[in-house]
């Protein structure tokens, strides 16, 4: 499947530039762009990436890994790749800070699927940084409070049947849009907190 480029409307007039691929050999190029072109040039308080994972239908492994910096996104479909991307593993372990929501399962899935762990202190769980009235504030609650009310229906507007299709290549447009918005929320929440 060739790499695809898409523009996704996140909320309001905010547009996201998305690269979607399952080609391991193309991932290093996009990782270099994320790091050298945008992350390295950012101010210190903006030197982090949004990270999110979508799981296989059996919930045992990683199907999709989403990386985000500002409005630049990489959606790598690990489940339909050749599962050999040492540059991605090096990138995840390189000391870059990643912001995500509810890291417990993601850490287990990365260990199971990739055989790696992101270094301690480099993976920020937004649920421990920001709380509303709940003991564990959901991503949707945080997104509505800090980004835009449109995120309140994001999960319910995404058909449950599509959650089982993260391994299907190529991904449907609705899955690409959901994955991009999901990673966008992780990035935007940490930026605002």
Range-by-range predicted roles:
Residues 1-49, 81, 126:
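N-terminal accessory regions of nucleic-acid-interacting proteins
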Residues 96-103:
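Acidic beta-strand-to-loop metal/phosphate-binding motif
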Residues 58-73:
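A short alpha/beta connector and helix-capping loop motif
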Residues 48-60:
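Short acidic, Gly/Ser-rich segments with clustered Asp/Glu that frequently serve as metal-coordination loops
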Residues 72-92, 96:
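Nucleic-acid-processing active sites and adjacent nucleic-acid-binding tracks
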Residues 113-123:
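A short alpha->loop->secondary-structure connector
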Residues 124-148:
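Short alpha-helix plus adjacent loop in nuclease-associated cores
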Residues 147-193:
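Acidic, Mg2+-coordinating catalytic module of metal-dependent nucleases/exonucleases
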């Amino acid at each position: 499947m060739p790499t695809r480029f898409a523009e996704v409307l996140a909320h309001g007039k905010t547009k996201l530039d998305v690269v979607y691929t399952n080609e391991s050999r193309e991932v290093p190029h996009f990782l270099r762009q994320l790091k050298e072109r945008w992350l390295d040039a950012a101010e210190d308080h903006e030197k982090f990436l949004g990270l999110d994972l979508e799981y296989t239908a059996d919930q045992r492994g990683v199907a999709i890994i989403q990386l985000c910096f500002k409005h630049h996104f990489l959606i790598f479909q690990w489940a339909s790749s050749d599962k050999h991307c040492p540059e991605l593993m090096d990138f995840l372990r390189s000391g870059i800070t990643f912001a995500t929501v509810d890291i417990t399962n993601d850490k287990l899935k990365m260990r199971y699927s990739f055989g790696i762990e992101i270094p301690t202190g480099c993976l920020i769980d937004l649920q421990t940084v920001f709380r509303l009235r709940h003991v564990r504030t959901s991503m949707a609650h945080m997104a509505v409070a800090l980004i835009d009310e449109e995120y309140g229906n994001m999960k319910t507007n995404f058909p449950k049947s599509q959650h089982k299709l993260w391994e299907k290549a190529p991904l449907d447009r609705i899955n690409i849009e959901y994955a991009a918005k999901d990673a966008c929320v992780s990035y935007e929440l940490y930026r605002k907190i």
